[in-house]
Amino acid sequence: MNPGRGGAYAAGRDGTRGTRRPHGLSHLDLLESESVHIFREVAGEFERPVILFSGGKDSIVMLHLALKSFAPAPVPFALLHVDTGHNFPEVIAYRDRVVAALGLRLEVASVQDFIDNGTLRERPDGTRNPLQTVPLLDAIGRHRFDAVFGGGRRDEEKARAKERVFSLRDEFGGWDPRRQRPELWRLYNGRHAPGEHVRVFPLSNWTELDVWQYVAREEIELPTIYYAHEREVFRRGGMWLAPGEWGGPREGEAVEKRRVRYRTVGDMSCTGAVDSAAATVADVVAEIATSRLTERGATRADDKLSEAAMEDRKREGYF
């Protein structure tokens, strides 16, 4: 990651660069500026912020923006990863490499630890994605984090679409949409009572396409699973899932090799791959530009549990 790069870029034929505005700033420049402002606002308002960092593309772009926000000084926040134990090996290897290269402090909250001590129980379907809330809230309370940066975007899902950039969480970590504060212009209110904290979403106004165009412009390295590759998968619920001891395949589900890539990265047991030949950033940008499905709608089994699955989890303290 190079925090020194950036600027106004004219639109290229491959669609990987933002369109210039009359005042000289591209669409990506405006999004970047907004995110940088949010990072600096949090640094000024809060005492112990932390950045959620899983090694997924949104958290990678978020970290890149944090680097730009404070360069040449180091990022003044720690990183936090809630580890389900069902991670893609390529993503964990990338996470560790980035943390070591940047010399940042990474706190890991392990779902397995809470299963081992009896606080959590394995789900019948094998997925651990919904189990992340308890380790997340425990880490926030134990380290006394008062602001938590997340990579959520409003285009991903309807519950995230209505959440504010500064999202107040109560003393139990829960989100109440009725307590949301107005955010006029670029004025953000970080006031909170003891025991409460604020989730902050610097990428709220970005889309999946914006993220990939920014990755192209800034030449940001991503884990290889975001690009087309050969992988063993099986079909379930209209999605291609990776085989594993925790989630399948079940009886009647056949494993086959396909050329796929991942649009989003989460728990292996509930994150689906999509058929794809997109092997480069430009290929991915072109593919997303013509897609009619959101990344979570196409690839996340945990969001299909009910119409309000994401909102229900967020009310309990989820990301």
UniProtKB/Swiss-Prot annotation:
Region feature Disordered, mapped onto this chain: 1-22, 296-319
Catalyzed reactions per annotation: sulfate + ATP + H(+) = adenosine 5'-phosphosulfate + diphosphate
Molecular function terms from GO: ATP binding; sulfate adenylyltransferase (ATP) activity
Domain of life: Bacteria
Entry-linked InterPro entries: PAPS_reduct_dom, Rossmann-like_a/b/a_fold, SO4_adenylTrfase_ssu, Sulfate_adenylyltrnsfr_sub2
Keywords: Antibiotic biosynthesis, ATP-binding, Nucleotide-binding, Nucleotidyltransferase, Transferase
Pathway: Antibiotic biosynthesis; mitomycin C biosynthesis
Family assignment from sequence similarity: Belongs to the PAPS reductase family. CysD subfamily.
HAMAP family: Sulf_adenylyltr_sub2
Descriptive protein name: Sulfate adenylyltransferase subunit 2
Source species of the chain: Streptomyces lavendulae
Underlying gene: mmcV
